[in-house]
A protein has these predicted regions:
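A surface-exposed partner-binding patch
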Residues: 1-102, 140-142
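Intrinsically disordered, low-complexity regulatory segments enriched in Ser/Thr/Pro
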Residues: 104-113
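A short, sequence-level motif marking secondary-structure junctions
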Residues: 100-104, 126-128
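N-terminal non-cleavable signal-anchor helices
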Residues: 96, 109, 121-123, 141
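Compact, glycine/acidic-enriched structural inserts
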Residues: 112-136
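A ubiquitous, low-specificity "background" feature that marks scattered single residues
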Residues: 94, 117, 134, 141-144
């Protein structure tokens, strides 16, 4: 799994599909936002946000990656043990978090809205998340 390759392929697909893509961020800005939220910007997070700055609109799968400004806004207050909110599916039917692992990766956690099921890990790394997303988005967007 190569995150940069999967992101490049998805970016091309999202542009063709008409998703409103935001410009990439500078590495220092990515590091600053994640540090402010009490979590390091892993190399995967840096690759993600220096390739794609987020989405202004959902893609054809009804998933939307948030901008760094939205991440900072959504993660105000005490840090969650489940990680940093970074995207949503189906207009917030559930949200996704990035949590740094002991080996320096960012695992992806699906977190339902309050009152719903407990959070579920959908991918051990961001590279795995986007590889699965590229093959069949439902694998990661609708965890069971």
């Amino acid at each position: 799994m190569d995150l940069a390759t999967d992101l490049a392929a998805l970016l091309a697909r999202w542009r063709i599909d008409g998703a409103d893509m935001l410009p990439p961020s500078e590495p220092a800005r990515v590091e600053a936002v994640f540090a402010q939220l009490g979590q390091p910007a892993t190399p995967e997070v840096l690759t993600l946000y220096t390739t794609l700055g987020g989405m202004a609109t959902m893609d054809n799968e009804f998933w939307r990656m948030w901008s760094l400004d939205e991440i900072a806004q959504a993660n105000q207050g005490p840090p969650s043990e489940w990680g940093v909110l970074f995207s949503d599916f189906l207009i917030h039917s559930h949200v996704f978090r990035l949590r740094t692992t002991a080996d320096g990766h960012s695992e992806v956690i699906a977190d339902a809205l309050p009152g719903a099921a407990a959070p579920v890990r959908v991918a051990a790394t961001l590279a795995e998340f986007f590889a699965l997303y590229r093959q069949n988005a439902d694998q990661v967007l609708t965890p069971r």
